[in-house]
Amino acid sequence: MAAAAGMLLLGLLQAGGSVLGQAMEKVTGGNLLSMLLIACAFTLSLVYLIRLAAGHLVQLPAGVKSPPYIFSPIPFLGHAIAFGKSPIEFLENAYEKYGPVFSFTMVGKTFTYLLGSDAAALLFNSKNEDLNAEDVYSRLTTPVFGKGVAYDVPNPVFLEQKKMLKSGLNIAHFKQHVSIIEKETKEYFESWGESGEKNVFEALSELIILTASHCLHGKEIRSQLNEKVAQLYADLDGGFSHAAWLLPGWLPLPSFRRRDRAHREIKDIFYKAIQKRRQSQEKIDDILQTLLDATYKDGRPLTDDEVAGMLIGLLLAGQHTSSTTSAWMGFFLARDKTLQKKCYLEQKTVCGENLPPLTYDQLKDLNLLDRCIKETLRLRPPIMIMMRMARTPQTVAGYTIPPGHQVCVSPTVNQRLKDSWVERLDFNPDRYLQDNPASGEKFAYVPFGAGRHRCIGENFAYVQIKTIWSTMLRLYEFDLIDGYFPTVNYTTMIHTPENPVIRYKRRSK
């Protein structure tokens, strides 16, 4: 059977190549880009047929149950259209019908979802050799961060790199960061004037880049962050797209070209800053210096290319979380003016009636603001899906997931399951006054992930968001425009607010 299948697939390749060559000349008139796109479409379809044929050759062992499979009559695309249109509704409906574990196909790939705390434990407790992260994320991150870092290296090396970065994300540095972020925020909002309507997501995205670059990259790199460099960051960030995940990286797409050019130019800026720091022999207590002084277990120091790649990764990985969360929280506070007033009064209670400059210790005592961030992350986690590739068979809830499946957990769904959360769709920061707001379930609340791949920048994100919003609340009152509260934009990898324009008015002194 295997030999017959192999001959069949070989025949498909030969016949397809002949037909494709003749057809492309007629249809495209020899246009290179058109021929390339048709070739890609043919290749994708052929890959799907090969996987389909190979799948039929695999026989499950007797007594092994595969997860419930949601059938689609549409070849290759599968449920991609329905899922892309409303992913949360799709997953919640599947959970109601099939339970916590189920599979379906999109664009030739099979996805198995683990919903609810018990099922999600498989992913968060797994070893990397069983449920692998690099197999899923490397094609997205490597063109953006560069080779030799993050998911482009073996997991033990990546863990060493994360440990180096984490050592620089410490309380001593956070205490320095608060005043830096407050100053950057005040300067940024000087241009807003007394009142108006602004796209708060765009504004906060720009501000997050400014503050993160200053805190995480050092003064040398921050001093070069002008409009041109900000656009380079935006182009680089554009590499985190559905197209980058689904399509080969060598395709001559405009967004891919912009990403690759931005990567080269930003690294050149970093190389100059790194060389300047090395040559000066000046020891500045920041993350750049932490990386320059760091060594692997075998004693090898980081190369300039590794340092630059890790700095890019540190900035962009956190930029999404902070900018999206900050924007969504603004709309939740604008919708609930009573809560917004309480957050403002908390500033005076904790920091003093005259609202002096913020300190790290004061920031820690802003408990209501802290709970507002937590609740925003519950209802609007920036990353809707966390994925791993199954390399070995995995058993969960009585089902066996075969190798080759992309195994997924959705924080968005887990964080509002009616089985786990009381008044699950309500924005209620006071739910965190309880010790176990999610019935004590370990993986019911995972906006920063869990286990070996938990986000190392969580504490910095809280410092950054709390400082920015403390400053914004001191400066302005915020309102929805004609009661409009944004819907979720599902067309991007990070789920941002749709048309995020907010109304503001400067507080009277």
Swiss-Prot record:
Single GO MF descriptor: oxidoreductase activity, acting on paired donors, with incorporation or reduction of molecular oxygen, reduced flavin or flavoprotein as one donor, and incorporation of one atom of oxygen
**Tissue expression remark:** Ubiquitously expressed with highest levels in testis, ovary, adrenal, prostate, liver, kidney and lung.
Task: Spell out where the chain crosses the membrane.
Answer: 30-50
Q: Could you confirm whether the keyword Heme appears in this record?
A: yes
tRNA-binding is among the record's keywords: no
Inhibition and activation profile: Inhibited by azalanstat. Inhibited by azole antifungal agents ketoconazole, itraconazole and fluconazole.
Q: Which residues bind heme?
A: C455
Q: What class of enzyme is it?
A: oxidoreductase
- Alphabetically ordered keywords of this record: Cholesterol biosynthesis, Cholesterol metabolism, Endoplasmic reticulum, Heme, Iron, Lipid biosynthesis, Lipid metabolism, Membrane, Metal-binding, Microsome, Monooxygenase, Oxidoreductase, Steroid biosynthesis, Steroid metabolism, Sterol biosynthesis, Sterol metabolism, Transmembrane, Transmembrane helix, Ubl conjugation
Query: What PROSITE patterns does the entry give?
Result: CYTOCHROME_P450
Q: Name one GO biological process term.
A: cholesterol biosynthetic process via 24,25-dihydrolanosterol
Pathway(s) of this molecule? Steroid biosynthesis; zymosterol biosynthesis; zymosterol from lanosterol: step 1/6
Report the principal subcellular site. Answer: endoplasmic reticulum
- What family is it from? Belongs to the cytochrome P450 family.
Protein name per the record: Lanosterol 14-alpha demethylase
Please report the organism this UniProt entry assigns to the protein. Homo sapiens (Human)
| Gene responsible for this protein | CYP51A1
